[in-house]
Design a protein with these regions (language model features):
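Conserved nucleotide-binding/hydrolysis micro-motifs of P-loop NTPases
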Residues: 193-194, 236-238
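Short secondary-structure junctions
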Residues: 4, 161-166, 210-215
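N-terminal nucleic-acid engagement/recognition segments and initiation subdomains in replication
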Residues: 1-109, 113, 179-181, 213
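P-loop NTPase catalytic core of nucleic-acid-dependent motor ATPases
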Residues: 70-188, 195, 200-201
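Conserved catalytic/switch belt of AAA+ P-loop NTPases
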Residues: 201-223
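AAA+/SF3 P-loop NTPase mechanochemical coupling elements
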Residues: 177-182, 216-234
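Residues at helix-coil transition
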Residues: 127, 160, 209-210, 236
Length: 238
């Protein structure tokens, strides 16, 4: 549960994988041990201190990564990182009736073959163990009441909130932190208006077609980032 972060000001700081707190001192660890001990009150503090002193804590790098279906803490390139993915609250139910959702997609997209294609893609991303994205983006256009919002909400419920990144418009795809927009299973952009051949169009095309990308986030050097998110664009324009 606890990982070593760093030494600062004469204190050792720890990260708690359960709460996400990253500035815990040894006293916090002592307090958590009190609830799991059966020795007398007089020995309580000394025993807790001894346990912490004799424990080797794995060092963690606090830059989180996104790894679906893996533990709260994952190892990558010999380093331990917090995992942003969380298991969705909604569980698969073989007895559930999928017809309302299929009918909704059929009406939204105009025909059954298009709905079937989208459903196959959703099933692949849900069942995939390695989170490798197909180099396919979706562009849904239509006026109010078209059903785009219902689809986005359903996606969030099925895959879990941690798997879906929702942004207001395409400006988020070109900000200094845009690389983080792609570190999910799905990225949903509302109010898109992109013209073929434009700078935004070419940037989106590049990101959709790649699985890793070199970028310089604010305060960081250039380095390689995984970008597993598949893009869904909603628009009122054809």
């Amino acid at each position: 549960r606890y990982f070593f972060v760093k030494q600062t000001g004469g204190h050792t700081l720890y990260w708690d994988s359960k709460t996400g707190h990253s500035n815990l001192t040894s006293k916090h660890l002592h307090q958590s041990l009190y609830a799991y001990t059966d020795f007398g009150e007089n020995d309580l503090v000394k025993r807790a201190q001894r346990i912490v002193e004799m424990t080797t804590f794995k060092p963690i790098i606090l830059e989180s990564i996104y790894k679906p279906k893996q533990a709260r803490v994952v190892q990558q390139h010999d380093h331990w990182h917090p995992n942003d993915w969380r298991e969705p609250e909604l569980k698969p139910d073989p007895q559930a009736d999928s017809k309302p959702f299929v009918d909704h997609l059929t009406r939204m997209l105009g025909n059954k073959p298009k709905a079937d294609y989208l459903i196959d893609m959703l099933a692949y991303r849900y069942q995939s163990e390695d989170n490798t994205k197909p180099h396919v983006a979706f562009y849904f256009y239509g006026g109010q009441g078209f059903g785009k919002g219902i689809f986005s909400t359903t996606l969030e419920k099925v895959f879990g909130e941690s798997a879906v990144r929702k942004v207001i418009d395409q400006n988020a795809l070109k900000s200094i932190s845009s690389i983080d927009v792609w570190k999910r299973t799905w990225t949903i952009v509302d109010e898109v208006d992109v013209k073929a051949g434009s700078t935004d169009y070419n940037r989106i095309k590049t990101m959709v077609g790649g699985s890793t990308f070199d970028a310089e986030r604010k305060g960081e050097h250039f380095k390689s980032h995984e970008i597993p998110a598949q893009l869904i664009m909603n628009s009122n324009h054809a």
